[in-house]
Amino acid sequence: ICPPTGCSDWDYTTEVKARVPSGRFDSTATQYPSFTANGATVDSFPYVYTPTWSYFLNVNTGNSDSIQNLLTRIYIFGDSLNPTVPTDSDFVFPAGYYNYIYTSGVVTDSIFVNYSGIYQQDFITVYSVFEVIEDFELGRMMTPYANGFALTWGRDYWYDVTDLIPVLKDTLTVRILYSGYSDGFSANITFYFIEGTAPRTPIRARIIYPLKYYEYGITTNPIENYLVPKTFPIDVNETQASIRVIPSGHSFGGASNCAEFCQKNYRWSVDGVNRFTQLVWRNDCGLNPLWAQPGTWLYDRSNWCPGDKALTRNHELTPFITPGNPVTLDMGFDAYNYTGGAGFNPGYILSTQLITYGPMNFQVNAAMDQIVAPNNEFEYSRVNPICDKPIVVIKNLGATPLTSCDIVYGIKGGTLATYSWTGNLAFNATATVNLPSITWGSSTGNQSRFEAWVTNPNNTVDQYTYDDTLRSSLTFTPMLPTQFALLWKTNNAFNETTYQLLNSSGTVLYSNGALAGNTVYRDTFNLVPGCYTLKIVDSGKDGLSFFANNDGTGYARLVNTVGSATIIKLFQADFGTSITYNFTVGFSTSLEEKLKSAVFNLSPNPTSGIVNINLILPKMEDVTISVMNQLGQVVYSEKRSNFQQDLFDINLENQPAGMYFVNVNTPSGKLTEKLIIQ
């Protein structure tokens, strides 16, 4: 969330980690002086108890002059158990040095100032014992380019930390570490405890390599110096295991732009045999739900995107361990030689954990893992709202491969549908399922709840039903007129951007023809009642406008074809990879055609008196437009019969400055907008 001073301009790493006492102890050695002279630590201090003098050259006479030395206070530290507390003190004059005799500016002789004693430094070494704290990273995200974000901006990031139950107990510290230099962002953490039984019970969680930044490609100090083989004991009751990894590459320069913008693999060998290879990369930053950030948000990166999570990678180790025998793990990276050019040495932040478990708790356990659509959650906003086929993700959390299940789904309180899925999912594997369409009009209201659950896995009884069901809140799609137009302008990279208008069967009804650069196109759509999807795709993944290229600026908007070309929908030009816009024509996805799907805009607002009203209703009906002041008095009113859409002005120049309410009343409902007259 943004702090009161505003969010940071830059993308910075933010780590959420549990600081877990390890039960192991270490120490640090600190040297303390046996004495100090006027608070300073010196190797030795010759002294006498009678005043001494220091000679110096008098530049006016060219001869020697002198000044009496000040007393020096000696503090003596003789207690090794309390090395900073003085045990004695002394007042002495400095001695043991030469005074030089000057004649006419020239040194002609010297006199040694004898000392009667000398304090000789004898440092006391004190060992401070401490318990080693291990940092178990729960999750990592990168802050967005947030210059100009509203102070109310905030976003939730969810992490499943079930595997870390063995360390998330007793007393520990949870730290959120923001690596930026400005006020940056505020953050908080909430743990949700879900009652039930895990698919397999975690027994131990151990750090493989410490959580830190590992420089990459430095020939004089290669990453392999730190990622050395590590051996871990495996108890007889630890029958399963996995490796949990969160990698993210940072810094860039040179030909390869490593490690932030280069595609490199890491590997895990188990007992000397390579078992896992993983590309450290995200190729979907242009589909970031937090789009149009004022920075290079759309560039694909090394396992992260600005404003999103660094992905957690899990590797199933069970086939390669033997309970009761130790296992040796070794991580490595593709060879790379950094030759310079980056702001700082490239590298990877690595979190690596070994998780061991007991046996599987269920043989047959199908789970509903995600509802992608319909869903109002921000992370799914690129594909929502929808008016057609729901999308869910199912997961196998049983020991037996999942080959079939039934998915029951629909709007809560409405008509439910059932879909029979078949496939082959191993334990922990997922499948994205595009479900057949439902009866959207079986619910009331503009917002509702969608629910989906799995049942009948492998044609048998699910042994654990508490993870079968998920619910989501949803918003119904807008309803557009039967005829409207796509008004769009290409940029210089005209061959990158295309559009398609599809019906609910996936048939392409309209698409762009041959294009030219920096040209405005107006394509008119005539549609029958139904559900539709407009897809605008940019193969360069940089939309119709992006500050960091030379493609220029285009735009895309939906406009009315009846009357003046008022805007129905204005699309963000800095959209990255694609835009998906779902809508209906001729019917609303709720039971009644609610006015909340209408278009109702006032401009300018504030106004000096003349107000332009853009009003589009879902269907033709009688309408009353009225204006009310803050006292509840109607100061303007007009009626229109058989009205559906128009762009018109009303004159309120005779009204005093203040706040007003513009009301639209129809048999289907009421719309209200605030208006300020200056």
Predicted regions and their residues:
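C-terminal outer-membrane/trafficking sorting elements
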Residues: 592-603, 607-678
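Residue-level detector of functionally pivotal "anchor" positions at catalytic/ligand-binding pockets or at interdomain
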Residues: 359-384, 471-472, 477-484, 581-603, ...
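Extracellular/secretory-pathway and virion-surface proteins
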Residues: 1-366, 372-376, 382-386, 397-400, ...
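Intrinsically disordered, low-complexity Pro/Gly/Ser/Thr-rich segments with frequent PxxP/GP/PP motifs
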Residues: 414-444
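Short glycine/proline/serine/threonine-rich loop/turn segments at secondary-structure transition edges
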Residues: 163-170, 440-449, 541-548, 658
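Terminal connector regions
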Residues: 440-478
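Short acidic/proline- and small/hydrophobic-mixed sequence motifs that coincide with surface turns
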Residues: 399-404, 494, 544, 611, ...
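Loop and turn regions of beta-sandwich accessory domains that flank beta-strands and are enriched
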Residues: 47, 53-54, 287-292, 297-323, ...
